[in-house]
Amino acid sequence: GLLYDYAMLAEKANKMDVMETALRKIIRLAPDNQHAYNALGYSFADRNIHLQEALALIEKASKIAPEDPFIMDSMGWVQFRLGRLQEAENYLRRAYAIRPDVEIGVHLGEVLWVKGQRAEAQQFWRDANQKDPQSDLLKSTLTRLRAQL
């Protein structure tokens, strides 16, 4: 809906407090909206803050839509942030099998890279690069990890 779109625009403008307020309002008004739970939880996980709340939010989203690959991606990412590398890999592999999306592939690549599975990580990143050579997420991940394709 409109409030969710507003929250996503606020995120793009880096107005995280506005995004958080809007998503919490959606959750209050529509407690079965998995997208709001997932977006808020992922936002926290991505910024590496409020990780326990992020996990709880993403778990709620997952109960509503257990086969949603984007929610699986978020669950994998919060598990990664919590240092649970094997759980992260499992969720991200399931998500990627359902939807081989650029963002999911970049996340899976990072988890594999951190686990020392660098050749496989690079393969996921090469696949992501083929799908979207302009991916800011891929570029920033490679730079941050000092990795190459």
Go through each PLM region and give its residues.
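Amphipathic alpha-helical repeat scaffolds of TPR domains
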Residues: 1, 34-43
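TPR alpha-solenoid repeat register
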Residues: 2, 36, 71, 104-105, ...
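Residue-level recognition of tetratricopeptide repeat
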Residues: 8, 33, 42-43, 68, 77, 101-102, 110, 135, ...
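Structural signature of tandem alpha-helical TPR/SEL1-like repeats
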Residues: 12-25, 47-60, 82-94, 116-127
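Structural marker of alpha-solenoid helical repeat scaffolds
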Residues: 29, 63-64, 97-98, 131
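Terminal, low-structured helical/coil segments at or just beyond the last alpha-helical repeat
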Residues: 49, 102, 107, 113-114, ...
